Amino acid sequence: MARKILVVGGAGLIGAGAALHLAEHGHAVSIAGRTPPNSKALSKLPFVRGSFLEDDITDAQLRGFDSLVFAAGNDVRQLPPGEDEAAYFHRANSIGVPAFFARAKDAGIADAVYVGSYYSYVVPERVAASGYLRSRQAADDGVRALAGPDFKVCSLNAPFTIGYVEGVIALPIDASVRYLLGQYGGGGPRWMIPGGANFMSILSYAEAVEGALERGENGKGYLVGDENWSFAHYCELLMDALGIPGKIEVRDAEHPSMPDFGLYAGRGATVAYEPDPDMLTRLRYRRHDAERAVREMAPYYRKLAEAA
């Protein structure tokens, strides 16, 4: 059944991928954010200007939708200069995200998906020491606590998500490509930190969003994912897709394209897991799609790097 869906954070990689996928599958999708997206494909979708933190997405606007996909959790990119990190993330994520979902529930939205972070699921022992991780866990818990007979909500907790949408720049991917192209990093042999992560294409994630809206268990937090790769293997796949010969050295040092402040599992940690079979049966997203995503995104990010 076609739905009227609002995607908050639709200008980011995950939100954009979900919005376009849902629109391609016959849903009436609008995206919401502070500024219109810089993407030809996304610009074809209706745009709702506003910030969930400022309450300027009105209740009347929310009442026009059947479903909500929320991909606007705040991270270091939104942290205002000079502001206390823990206090900001508590206000934006711990408090702001569940409050927005409560408004959506009160407005009559029937189904919602929260795009969460996988860290509290895979390294729960590190949550207490990080204001950011505490805020993402609190947002996830707070959103799912709103589940009820008239409001179906679940979370999809994302791993390292890769791919591209024209006009959208995912900074971690952009940084890795620029490093491999030699645009920064000091020259010398290309290297990467030890450890690894679970990687997932934005198409697989978008299919998981669609599955969650249609068949997700109310109040459930899902740990989604696809392929377990070392960071070195990921960079070698990127090098191959970029046409760069050679292999990646592994060094236990802070990396220019993957700095320690963004490694919430810790430098050298390997986050590896297999998605739950029951979840896969319910959400029905494709597997083993991450390598395709690397091959397809590499020319796009090369073009961005060479135009800079």
Task: Give the label of every model feature segment.
Residues 8, 32, 71-72, 112-118, ...:
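SDR active-site strand-loop-helix element
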Residues 86-135, 154:
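Conserved Rossmann-fold NAD(P)-dependent oxidoreductase catalytic core, especially the SDR/UDP-sugar
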Residues 39, 45-95, 121-124:
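NAD(P)H-binding glycine-rich loop region in Rossmannoid oxidoreductase-like domains
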Residues 5-25:
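N-terminal Rossmann NAD(P)H-binding glycine-rich loop of SDR-like oxidoreductase domains
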Residues 163-177, 212-222:
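Glycine/proline-rich active-site loop of Rossmann-fold NAD(P)-dependent oxidoreductases
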Residues 116, 143-168:
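Conserved beta-loop-beta element that borders a ligand/cofactor-binding pocket
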Residues 177-200:
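A conserved pocket-lining segment of Rossmann-fold NAD(P)-dependent short-chain dehydrogenase/reductase
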Residues 196, 202-264, 284-308:
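Mid/C-terminal beta-alpha module of Rossmann-like enzyme folds, strongest
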